[in-house]
């Protein structure tokens, strides 16, 4: 049996004590580290959860606010306190006229009497302080036969309560009739070159309108209508007709099928529309829109007219044929029912509730030099 010296025994004991203390300290440090890591994880989870909860509440609250804003906007629109443009279904109710076609395949409205909310539209456009232009051409004997009636009736019924500028194109401005205009209405008269044939007068108006839009009309009006002079207003032609690109259904063809329409059918013409194509037959006696849209329309139509002249061909219905070709590929954003340009020679069917404009008697033998 080996006897360990006392001082060595003390050293060994002290060494063991230090080792055990070091081991305990190491274990304690590890546990603290583990606790710290767990604490950080728990804290991170809590923070992420808090962020998610806050984000969820924000999204829902934002959505709620958006719904409230929409509802407030609707209420303001109903009360006339907003200048936000009314949406189609705010002012247009096609169900009021189930017996007629009221919406095109491309979802544009066809405006009939009873389908629109006049009061709502008037509130909006009155606050917009719009100006509407109206071009009309009167040459030769058309001046004495039609111009005065057209202007006097337009002054009474066209865009009542809004600023209007009548642009009158004449080949002899000295024959301009005296017309008393309403306070919000003004008149600009321009002299244009006389043409030998009425067909050329009809077609050249596209060029003339385009030139005047570029020169001054685009800076003067918000909307522009172009109309034939041989017709007369009979009732309000109001803001329900305004749109970016507005077309007029031709009274004689609004119930016909496209293959029956008198489109230009000769392939050589720029106005050619083949059988099996087409939507409606549009009347060149009334069309309108914003100045930029009318500028594009007149440019394209006149381009087609010039192309036909190069090929020594003339479209069947002149500028109207080219107008129909344009609308085939540039769909109108709004269409006016035949009530807005009606021919009483057809009679008065039950679906024609309120005639806005009526054709005048076509005395071609008196007003045209080459019938």
Curated annotation (Swiss-Prot):
Main location: Golgi
Summary of the tissues where the protein is detected: Dorsal root ganglia neurons (at protein level). Expressed in the heart, brain, spleen, kidney, lung and liver.
Annotated Gene Ontology cellular component terms: Golgi apparatus; Golgi cisterna; Golgi cisterna membrane; vesicle
Source organism, top-level taxon: Eukaryota
Residues the record lists as binding Mn(2+): 228, 230
Role description: Synthesizes the galactose-alpha(1,3)-galactose group by catalyzing the transfer of a galactose residue, with an alpha-1,3 linkage, on terminal lactosaminide (Gal-beta-1,4-GlcNAc-R) disaccharide borne by a glycoprotein or a glycolipid. Preferentially glycosylates proteins, can synthesize galactose-alpha(1,3)-galactose on glycoproteins but cannot synthesize the glycosphingolipid isoglobotrihexosylceramide or isogloboside 3 (iGb3).
Entry's family note: Belongs to the glycosyltransferase 6 family.
Protein name: N-acetyllactosaminide alpha-1,3-galactosyltransferase
Naturally occurring in which organism (per UniProt): Rattus norvegicus
Source species taxonomy: Eukaryota, Metazoa, Chordata, Craniata, Vertebrata
């Amino acid at each position: 049996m080996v006897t360990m010296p006392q001082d060595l025994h003390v050293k060994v004991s002290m060494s063991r004590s230090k080792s055990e203390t070091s081991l305990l300290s190491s274990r304690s440090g590890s546990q603290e580290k583990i606790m710290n890591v767990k604490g950080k994880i728990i804290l991170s989870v809590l923070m992420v959860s808090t962020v998610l909860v806050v984000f969820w509440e924000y999204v829902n609250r934002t959505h709620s606010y958006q719904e409230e804003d929409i509802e407030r906007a609707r209420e303001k629109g109903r009360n006339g306190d907003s200048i936000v443009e009314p949406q189609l279904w705010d002012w247009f109710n096609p169900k009021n006229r189930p017996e007629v076609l009221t919406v095109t395949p491309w979802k544009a409205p066809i405006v009939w009497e009873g389908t629109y909310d006049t009061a709502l539209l008037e509130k909006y456009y009155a606050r917009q302080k719009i100006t509407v232009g109206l071009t009309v051409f009167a040459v030769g004997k058309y001046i004495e036969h039609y111009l005065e009636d057209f202007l006097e009736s337009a002054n009474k019924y066209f865009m009542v309560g809004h600023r209007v500028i009548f642009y009158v194109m004449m080949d002899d401005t000295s024959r301009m009739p005296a017309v008393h205009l309403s306070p919000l209405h003004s008149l600009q008269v321009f002299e244009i070159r006389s043409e030998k044939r009425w067909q050329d007068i009809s077609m050249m108006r596209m060029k003339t309108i385009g030139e005047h839009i570029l020169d001054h009309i685009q800076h003067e009006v918000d909307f522009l209508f172009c109309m034939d002079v041989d017709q007369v207003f009979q009732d309000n032609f109001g803001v329900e007709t305004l749109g970016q690109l507005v077309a007029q259904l031709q009274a004689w063809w609004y119930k016909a099928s496209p293959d029956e329409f008198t489109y230009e059918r000769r392939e050589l013409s720029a106005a050619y529309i083949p059988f099996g194509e087409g939507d409606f037959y549009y009347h060149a006696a009334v069309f309108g829109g914003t100045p930029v849209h009318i500028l594009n329309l007149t440019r394209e139509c006149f381009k087609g007219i010039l192309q036909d002249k190069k090929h020594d061909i003339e479209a069947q219905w002149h500028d109207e044929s080219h107008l129909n070709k344009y609308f085939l590929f540039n769909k109108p954003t709004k269409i006016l029912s035949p009530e807005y340009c009606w021919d009483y020679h057809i009679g008065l069917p039950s679906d024609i509730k309120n005639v806005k404009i009526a054709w005048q008697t076509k005395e071609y033998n008196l007003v045209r030099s080459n019938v």
